[in-house]
């Protein structure tokens, strides 16, 4: 395709601001989606965990044909823990669509990804979404975004950004919040007008950098990236240059383009287009594919350093091997090595013993997604509690700090301020917003935030919004942070849990187990309401005598136990 008719754009948004919904509507209204896919909501979230958590973890590519233009859209993760995905995506596009909620305005993750976009010199198009909500305040949000851009050091050109107002769920967009068009046409037209065509030479020798990887059982590894020069056809011979500069010869089997959500085989792809390449084994992210006669590798893509680590090890509890299919250290090691191929922000090192592996990532969420993925794939493993990664600078110890933005009702302010004080956080700003809510901004050490989210929801009765993003490494704060106020209930006997015992124990705290589950001696079965640990017997049955007949029991009602 002629590069003048090509547009490459990435969508940036905070978690749950409607990014994937917006892409769905663009696909439907441009006529790119066929009927069978129209019933599925959030089509771009293809992974089970993405649909359940309501977040995007992996960057997706899709293409829309609009009038005589072809628009390549890349959906980026909104969470800073997946920052390495964002980094690579931005190397493939000429502009970004910044999507902001019309109620909450820009959030920390918006700040994180926008900063990355400005560093790459990209000009944003601002989309203020959810303007149909009764509490929407689009003009306030616009001021907040302008202030954010200014704080991030945007150039005059970047500050002169275009604004579109939208209601993605209803499939409407317009130039004014109270004058939306019948469909998404204003947004699609804006993309074709304002986004520059790729600055590439289609007659130069072929060159392409791998920005993402996929695989399937038929063709093996699939390399995804943007062609930065020349053109490519199936069966072309190329030279692969890795980030260390080592060269090897290879042959391309297929060239796949995008049409909607489908990958379609193409006879030729030219510079500026985002394509998938198959047939080359052992591809890695950052590898450059070059014309054999003109070998000029592109600079390797940079990735943020990990900040949190956990130990993965073989499950050595008395119940080992009962639930999982893959239980040995060899299974765990192979799976982690497989994950390293496409999860480039992950680090895996040997642990203190042969069956332990130290796994480091960008944050709690990054590692929890990996653990949950492995659990669903039938891996059985034990994990340690998360530890932050500290650095030595000269003779000083530095630790990671995060910006934490908390949006709560005013009556919860005292409890939150007290708890953040215990976690060694410093208050940076406090703004009272409309409807009796307030926004607090803290600078907190990462170790103080581990395990805080569930407690935060309890303190705010589920009405608070907590977001955090890595900011910098700074001087470590002295002293330990007490992350757990409660003691635990520990089983002093092995056996099966019984409702009678649990009914009497639930007054002492929250249970982790329900009725009829096998437990072992020493297993933690609940949270104690006080700060000391309590040995308990969850297997105790009711003593039956002639005086106390089984039929005269009171009705035992168990409070639902905490499930992980």
Residue ranges and their predicted role:
Residues 123, 133-193:
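Canonical P-loop GTPase G-domain recognition
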Residues 102, 128-130, 137, 168-169, ...:
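A short beta-strand-to-loop transition that corresponds to the Sensor-1 phosphate-sensing loop
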Residues 16, 22, 54, 73-75, ...:
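Residue-level signature of catalytic and energy-coupling elements of molecular machines
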Residues 86-100, 105-149:
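Conserved P-loop NTPase nucleotide-binding/switch module
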Residues 142, 160-162, 182, 189-193, ...:
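Accessory interaction regions appended to the cores of large information-processing enzymes
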Residues 1-100, 104-106, 144, 213-216:
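P-loop NTPase switch module centered on the Walker A-proximal segment
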Residues 209, 216-217, 485-486:
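Flexible, glycine-rich loop/tail regions that form catalytic "lids" or insertion modules at the edges
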């Amino acid at each position: 395709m002629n590069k003048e008719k090509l547009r490459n754009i990435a969508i940036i948004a905070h978690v749950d601001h409607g990014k994937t919904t917006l892409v769905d509507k663009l696909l439907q209204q441009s006529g790119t989606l066929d009927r069978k896919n129209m019933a599925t909501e959030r089509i771009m979230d293809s992974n089970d965990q993405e649909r359940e958590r309501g977040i995007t973890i992996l960057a997706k590519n899709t293409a829309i044909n609009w009038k005589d233009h072809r628009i390549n859209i890349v959906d980026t993760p909104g969470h800073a823990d997946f920052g390495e995905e964002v980094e690579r995506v931005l190397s493939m596009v000429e502009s970004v669509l910044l999507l902001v909620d019309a109620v909450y305005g820009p959030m920390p993750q918006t700040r994180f990804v926008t900063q990355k976009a400005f560093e790459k010199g990209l000009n944003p198009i601002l989309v203020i979404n959810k303007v149909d909500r009764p509490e929407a305040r689009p003009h306030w949000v616009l001021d907040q975004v302008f202030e954010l851009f200014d704080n991030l050091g945007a150039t005059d050109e970047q500050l002169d950004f275009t604004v579109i107002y939208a209601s993605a769920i209803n499939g409407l967009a317009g130039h004014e919040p109270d004058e939306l068009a019948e469909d998404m046409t204003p947004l699609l037209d804006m993309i074709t007008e304002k986004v520059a065509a790729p600055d590439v030479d289609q007659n130069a020798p072929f060159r392409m950098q791998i920005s993402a990887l996929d695989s399937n059982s038929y063709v093996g590894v699939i390399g995804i990236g943007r062609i930065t020069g020349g053109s490519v056809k199936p069966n072309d011979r190329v030279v692969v240059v890795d980030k260390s500069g080592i060269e090897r010869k290879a042959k391309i089997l297929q060239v796949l383009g995008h049409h909607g959500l489908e990958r379609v085989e193409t006879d030729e792809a030219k510079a500026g287009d985002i394509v998938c390449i198959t047939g080359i084994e052992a591809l890695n992210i950052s590898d450059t594919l070059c014309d054999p006669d003109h070998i000029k590798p592109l600079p390797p893509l940079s990735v943020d350093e990990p900040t949190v680590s956990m130990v993965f090890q073989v499950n050595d509890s008395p119940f080992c091997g009962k639930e999982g299919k893959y239980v040995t250290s060899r299974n765990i090691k192979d799976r982690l090595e497989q994950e390293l191929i496409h999860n480039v922000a992950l680090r895996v090192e040997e642990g203190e013993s042969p069956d332990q592996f130290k796994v480091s990532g960008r944050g709690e969420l990054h590692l929890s997604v990996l653990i949950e993925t492995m659990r669903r794939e039938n891996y059985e493993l034990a994990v340690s509690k998360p530890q932050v990664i500290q650095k030595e600078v000269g003779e000083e110890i530095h630790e990671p700090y995060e910006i934490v933005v908390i949006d709560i009702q005013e009556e919860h302010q005292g409890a939150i301020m007290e708890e953040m004080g215990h976690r060694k956080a410093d208050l940076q700003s406090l703004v009272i917003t409309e409807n009796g809510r307030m926004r607090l901004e803290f600078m907190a050490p990462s170790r103080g935030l581990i395990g805080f989210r569930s407690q935060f929801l309890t303190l705010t009765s589920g009405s608070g919004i907590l977001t955090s993003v890595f900011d910098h490494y700074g001087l470590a704060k002295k002293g330990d942070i007490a992350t757990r106020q409660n003691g635990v209930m520990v089983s002093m006997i092995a056996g099966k849990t019984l409702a009678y015992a649990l009914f009497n124990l639930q007054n002492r705290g929250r249970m982790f187990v329900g009725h009829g589950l096998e437990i072992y001696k020493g297993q933690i079965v609940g949270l104690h309401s006080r700060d000391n640990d309590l040995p308990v017997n969850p297997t105790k049955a009711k003593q039956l005598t002639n005086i106390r007949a089984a039929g005269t029991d009171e009705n035992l009602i168990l409070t639902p136990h905490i499930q992980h």
